């Protein structure tokens, strides 16, 4: 079970790497993906600062370095950054590639991420759902903006 939890913990990073690999030869989508991934992260931090909803009490750590990372803005759990980043990647990659095989793999990794964050008491179900929805919206908006304003490949 530890390997599944570890995959869940690193799910957003795994999905980011998958996106970079898949989009490497499609420059406008590659650069857009990386740029908007950063914007998605910034949106998450701004929402956490604005909403200020704390994480659940007594969250468990999967990695030793986790003990000190839930301070400052990271003490807040709304919306879940893991869920938001995962669903940003899923949405962006699906809209660009429309490949059901990639979608299934990405959804599997994102499901492990959602499960890990919930089972380790790092987020409530509401924080995970809102994070997922924000990620979908940012992913969709990113591809829409790129398709509208960046016409060269």
What are the functions of these language-model segments?
Residues 98, 105-106, 144, 149-151:
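Short, charged/polar low-complexity linear motifs in solvent-exposed/disordered segments
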Residues 50-55, 59, 124, 145-153:
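Membrane-interfacial segments
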Residues 25-29, 69, 133, 147, ...:
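Charge-rich, low-complexity amphipathic helices
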Residues 1-78, 84-119:
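Hydrophobic alpha-helical bundle signature of multipass membrane enzymes
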Residues 82-86, 123-147:
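Alpha-helical transmembrane segments that form the membrane-embedded catalytic/substrate-binding core
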């Amino acid at each position: 079970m530890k390997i599944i939890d570890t995959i869940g913990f690193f799910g957003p990073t795994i999905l980011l790497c998958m996106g970079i690999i898949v989009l490497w030869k499609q420059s406008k989508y590659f650069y857009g993906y990386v740029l908007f991934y950063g914007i998605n992260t910034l949106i998450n931090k701004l929402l956490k600062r604005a909403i200020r909803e704390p994480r659940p009490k007594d969250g468990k750590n999967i990695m030793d370095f986790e003990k000190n990372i839930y301070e400052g803005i990271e003490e807040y759990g709304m919306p879940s950054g893991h869920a938001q980043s995962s669903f940003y990647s899923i949405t962006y990659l699906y809209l660009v590639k429309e490949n059901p095989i990639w979608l299934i793999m990405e959804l599997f990794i994102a499901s492990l991420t959602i499960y890990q964050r919930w089972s380790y008491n790092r987020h409530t179900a509401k924080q995970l759902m809102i994070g997922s929805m924000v990620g979908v919206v940012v992913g969709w908006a990113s591809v829409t903006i790129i398709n509208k304003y960046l016409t060269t490949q």
